[in-house]
């Protein structure tokens, strides 16, 4: 059968044209017929033109790889035609000449394709050459697991806070509302830059960075510069004065008092007033030391109880001499000295944990021995790794199980907050990544069902918060605490407080008591036997590496004085400034007037000096949210972290702040304990907490792991006791005084006053959006109840170990305890309200307040008050005024009493005549009165 020839395609023509470039014209003429026949046979075997294009491109690349400058040379046909062909006289081209011209034309069309092909070939060759070169950042992977890459990522991003089981529903984001309001907001004046200030205060501080001044209390006569007057061991004094005893602070004057105030008090008060003031200060110092500071002086009975309860440190007692102690410390300069297993050492090396910290050196060998531990160290000293490393090491030697039913949950780690539990979970997973140890995270805010599924597999380590753990113990099938061998409590002093007391007792009762090891860790750990005895500890070992309640060595503590004025408040009205509608005479110089100045001082710091990587601690969730709105309206990127947010929002806020997406993190004390957020440079305390432990945990978010850090605290008149305690517990080089120019603070007050309507509008719109979401949720809930009623009611009811009233009472007790830590004045006497004032000023202030209260009562009653009542109040005021002490040297004014004089005259006449009392009775009878 005759095969029909197909017409040559365009690809075949391009191939022929490419072939013609590599052969001479003579050879092409000689082999014209065979070549055409061969091409015809080749064309008959093709299926499509697309394959021909790919093959042609590869063929052209192979033929022209040797000629590097073929693209820049002129066309070969133009050079060969004059030598090997002759043009007829009539100017007509021959058949072969026309073919060569057509081929040259086709080559011109495909020149771009050939250029790209040759260029890609050249680039690929260059890439191969670059790949063979040695990278300057090349590192040998010793273990072959890519651990160096993992460490680089961990160093850049910190601990991984991502968790599973979150509810990815649409969230209410106030940032969208703020951005919408900000677009229509008029342009606000820019804050005064530090470089452009021309005030006299800044001219004196040009040699100091960031307006930082040493607290030179005794050398400064200016009231604006004087901060902590009377304290002799503050920075700026001589070296000998720096080494004075810290106990001298208790006998000195108020740190916030000034020379001018002291002089006026000396002029106005008498000796009795001075004695009363000194007695009052002494009583307040005694109360402060008893309520806020653990007494260093222990009675013999307390020492005996602690000696009987605690066991001796075996490492400390084994070092009989200083040389042996030194050799022991040298031997424990690396984790290899603890005889840890290879997977644990491998993980520590990948995390760049080479040398153990002091708390780790003392804790790991004792924990490996299975002893109970009560440990304390400063913030950022590696306490989490101190209990996680020995725990994982002990689990590596456990008996291997063949089936999941034989697995046991052996370790329970408790944390007071969800974020701290998530961080412990991340640290544990990183240290145990080369082992087969399984972890389970049980915290509130995440899916209960996913946690139940993980607990059914009986993971070796369970990290939980107390509330969710009790929920799983009572309501999750096949999960118990009967096999717990190691119980760890992070931030144990918080777990021992009243808010967690009932839950902690329930957990301890569920855990076995026989061979259980218990370890307690905290930066402010207590050694009170009465609190620790309920945890069923067995001769625990006390490991307090650092002095009690001290800050990190590289932490600089700055204090900004807050002065009260007669202003009426700033943005946010009641919530933000803390001011209600009060007369100026009442709020002038008072506590609420100080609260009105705090937002302006805070924004002055955040817009001028600390512009990134700054954590700001406030005392309430409402204040944190309102400050976030103010920051957003001013164009400052800020996140918030408190209990009113969902768990997804809390994790997102932490992650954004850690990754640098937000510059500020406004948080309550929810984030003050245990969190290790990478890159925190500054911590700002919007107000001073009422207890020193809370202050230590707040400022401990910076200056961690030997890094530098700075803590700035806004201090008012009522915070002087906490200020004195902070000065006493810190070294001289750590305390500094920061002065914010009054012009900057006044400018920021004006800005906040302009923002007040916008803040109210954002809050109002957010409230409306929240109401709509609640309505939608209730509607969806009703639909689910109607469509899936049988399934919903068939679910078993979840139980709790407390009744509803007991749970409410425990919640109220926890809230009261937190408020007591935030404001020590709530439980103090009434005289603390006028602390720091002389007797004359105190009485004047009391009188002004009484007058204002009477004025309010008079206006509120609207004339209903009787005249007798008004006269009674006037009489009370007159009596109080008469009892006020007078100045020395002024004799009291004696007024003649006419009635008393007449009576004395009548009595004198009878006595002169020798009469008696009977005569006076007759005189009365003669006067007309009836005798009885």
Swiss-Prot record:
The gene is DRS1. Residues 1-24, 317-334 have a biased composition (Low complexity). One of its GO terms (biological process) is rRNA processing. Its EC number is 3.6.4.13. ATP-binding RNA helicase involved in ribosome assembly. The keyword S-adenosyl-L-methionine does not apply. The lineage of its organism: Eukaryota, Fungi, Dikarya, Basidiomycota, Ustilaginomycotina. Associates with pre-ribosomal particles. This is ATP-dependent RNA helicase DRS1. CDD domains: DEADc_DDX27, SF2_C_DEAD. It comes from Mycosarcoma maydis. GO terms for cellular component: nucleolus; preribosome, large subunit precursor. Residues 192-210, 242-253, 262-299 have a biased composition (Acidic residues).
